[in-house]
């Protein structure tokens, strides 16, 4: 069970926080994994729970290291770390969508401080001047630094919760994350940072390998990348049509696509639900581009197909864009809309600067060949074309890569 205090319940029961019930954690992953419909709301509760457990454990080990105030604030920081996410989470966290573009951390801070938002009023009433320390914990400017590292680091309660939750939601049975052993393995260094017991390297290996597999198999899944492209392209096309007075947008869609002075209060009214409703309605429009994207999303029919490439480098893949565009055009399609290029980049484990340290002060990389093998950046490139020319596209790509 997840137990919460009356103060935390009041935060959860604000309209600003309840909005997270309607922001899917994994954007469009449910097209590939039908049960992946969990939300930022449940993830935030889970992060709060893990932070509460970890703070309790550290206070047992270091009775004088954590004040009552910080013991109260750190779990609240975990609870609110994602409160600023846009609809569909990271998928719409881009200036391609928002006319008023800010990262979700910045939006979250504004939602916590803007007097028009109910969350701000509740935090001020409950915490008073401690709101400033709460914000410092969340942005990493507080000392001792382990208070912030619990919330945001390469081994934090955010990642621990979402990886377990995403595994369960997608059914991706890869890797192993032993939450109990990880939480029991954490210590506070003399310098005030969060470190891992040297004899618990293997539990961190399990966590990092699981994260690596989840990016390969879930977060970068081909249907996830394709449907995200459909949504972002739909909104970009809708903005274009609106600017040329060929499409009337709903109030909330105008706030996303055209309002360059979007307030925190108006931002807090944006959820997945209105985006889905608007996009699905566009399936009936006369514009073939917008209706094409919308129809595919509404029906899951007529999807573009991934061009399966032989082994290649990113540089080789980048050189395919122009010849594939020519192929698509010569086949009678519009290359601007019917050739979809998705490029994914993600940092793996990053040692040394912000890395995971052991209790002897060394980076965990030095003690684990397994972690060393998944450090650095991993990336991928995908091309999608109409199904009728997939075979031709694959033949062309193979010829060019093998040259």
What are these regions (language model features)?
Residues 1-73, 83-403:
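Histidine-centered, transition-metal-coordinating active-site segments
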Residues 76-77:
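Alpha-helical scaffold segments that flank or form the walls of functional sites
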